[in-house]
Amino acid sequence: QNSIIFLINNGGYTIEVEIHDGPYNVIKNWNYTGLVEAFHNGEGACYTAKVRTEEELTEALEAALGPKKDCLCFIEVIVHKDDTSKELLEWGSRVSAANSRPPNPQ
């Protein structure tokens, strides 16, 4: 079994948005699976999949663990940009508050 790489793609910097939102957090989303395919240029054993549902993830894993097990497997998991935990939201608020304080005099 070769490696399976998972890239969790939420389309941006969700953590940074929770700390301090701004236009600098809007980024161009890359075609990560296309990038992997470009790197191996058809000359290596490589399997890529872009999944958006649990069913698609199951299918990709079955391929990665089955017929593509001898390949480098790259699975991009697309999640909603606002898919975040309550704990992350609370942490972001605390960091944002700390960032807005004046500097500590030395």
Curated annotation (Swiss-Prot):
InterPro entries: PDC/IPDC-like (IPR012110), THDP-binding (IPR029061). Induction: By hypoxic stress. Its EC number is 4.1.1.1. Binds 1 metal ion per subunit. Binds 1 thiamine pyrophosphate per subunit. Its cofactor is a metal cation; thiamine diphosphate. It is an enzyme of class 4 (lyase). Mg(2+) binds at residues 10, 12. It comes from the Eukaryota. SUPFAM superfamilies: Thiamin diphosphate-binding fold (THDP-binding). The keyword Metal-binding applies. Gene3D superfamilies: 3.40.50.970. It catalyses: a 2-oxocarboxylate + H(+) = an aldehyde + CO2. One of its GO terms (molecular function) is metal ion binding. Keywords: Decarboxylase, Lyase, Magnesium, Metal-binding, Stress response, Thiamine pyrophosphate. Homotetramer. Belongs to the TPP enzyme family. This is Pyruvate decarboxylase 2. It comes from Zea mays (Maize).
